[in-house]
Amino acid sequence: MIKTNIKISFGELRDLYVNLLAVANKKLPIRLSHVISKNMQLISEEVHLIDDCRIKMAENYADKDENGEPKFNDNKYIISDENAMKFNAELNEYYSTTTEIDIYKTSSNELNKLEEQRYDGLSPSEIGALMIILDEESDTN
């Protein structure tokens, strides 16, 4: 396992967390499971801050009731079409903000172990999502 520093946008970081969460409960080789868990711990606080800011933006653009509180429908903010365009533009700009974070990587050889019956398989999209935490040049012990 190698710790490395990368530049990543807020949107990519949020997507990485969602992708790691999606495979975290699968039966995977222990080194791969470990690096997934370590990365989830490393980035979870930052992702929660990103989501808190997204929620504040949504509250700002949401239609308000007579008390000035955001309106909801099915646990979603009600946002007018005009404000939705502004919200999406601001959110996209926010998600493009770049940050530096440390992540852990493991050998891409760990994927070869997925062929064993005792492990769950991963779809091509799941493997693609994990590429950022795989190091093709190392053979970690």
Mark where each language-model region is.
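N-terminal interaction modules that seed assembly of large macromolecular complexes
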Residues: 3-63
